[in-house]
Amino acid sequence: MATHNPTVTEIRTRFLSYMKENGHAVIPSGSLVPENDPTTLFTGSGMQPMLPYLLGQPHPLGKRVADSQKCFRSQDIEEVGDNRHTTFFEMLGNWSFGDYFKEEEIVWMFNFFVKEYGLDLKNFYVSCFSGNESLGVPRDTFSAELWQNLFKEQGLQVGIGDAPEQDGIRTTDGVTDYIFYYSEKK
């Protein structure tokens, strides 16, 4: 179990170092006010600055990058103050532009939380993309099976839930998994 509550700086540094050890170039955060994007006032997700590379443009630093993207979200500003909503936050991300897929990604995240931080598996909850019938995008059973197998290897039987909707709309990228960790209050 983790011995202390790490600071934001410690979490960011440890994540980026871990991804660098796994062959990723560490890049700085994109601008909070995106350039050349008339569709939005602020960067609201980690993937927003990555869109050109996700759509096929080569990234100057290669096929694997990691970052801590500054984000601002105002769509749920009335909810700020509960345990889930914020307006400004940093989103840690690692990106593959045609280099690796779910098998490597899920194992890396599992190892980061469990081996790097020593978090207790019994406090994890993982949700995977549940599909979108209207768009013809199927449920992501592949990711769910990968997560379940990792937990089974540690002697735990688990169920995997559906990823939550965002403002009533499910995302269409089939790799969206959410990892929740419930810590005990003392």
Residue spans of the language-model regions?
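Structured aminoacyl-transfer and RNA-binding surfaces used for tRNA recognition/handling
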Residues: 2-186
